[in-house]
Amino acid sequence: MNLKRLFTTEGVKGKKDYLDSQKKYEIIRTVIFFGISIALFVAGFVTTGDRNNLLTIVAVLGCLPASKSMVGAIMYCRQSSLAKEDADKIESHTKDLTCLYDMVFTTREKIYPVLHMAVCGNNIAGYMPMKKAPKNPKKALSENACAEHLDTCLKVDNYKDVTIKIFTDLGKYITRLSQLQELTTEDKHTEGICNTLKSIAL
């Protein structure tokens, strides 16, 4: 177990199976945080015989980061990594492309699980699989809305004129990957764009 992952996802975000592996760290951290608060409350009550003491205040304040951690754990538990069979199909078409896995982007209204992305200069392609059609059409994930959200975030970091295409169909996504492999484009923005994408992802 990498204890560093209890407090940071640096170096692992964007890697294959990131979402599935990070879940346990989020849950463990949440349990530890709540455990500390409970231990402080019990210690204060045992030593003073009364719950109205300084340690109770500290325990209550400790529930704030614990609750925040719990929200994060719930977010991770609701997501899953890219299916192995899909990953195998995709990886046969990503030679020389810079790729990111398990990128979940959030807005106030939507959650966009883009489980694979390829970045080639100022070109981005992403695969957002549709598990099943929602009962309410308004809750359906929109490839265009996701692309617009990412474009807005990239412009904040001065990455303009970026072509972003998000696909819910695996076949069309693989076709786009093949097209990206044939592009002759400057690679100078790839690393910076990847860093921005990772910074705004779950």
Where are these regions (language model features)?
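Surface-exposed interaction regions that form or flank ligand-binding interfaces
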Residues: 1-100, 107, 144, 148-155, ...
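Acidic, Ser/Thr-rich low-complexity segments on the non-lumenal side of membrane proteins
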Residues: 95-133
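Short C-terminal domain-edge/linker segments immediately following a structured domain
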Residues: 130-134, 158-161
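Mg2+/Mn2+-dependent nuclease catalytic core
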Residues: 132-150
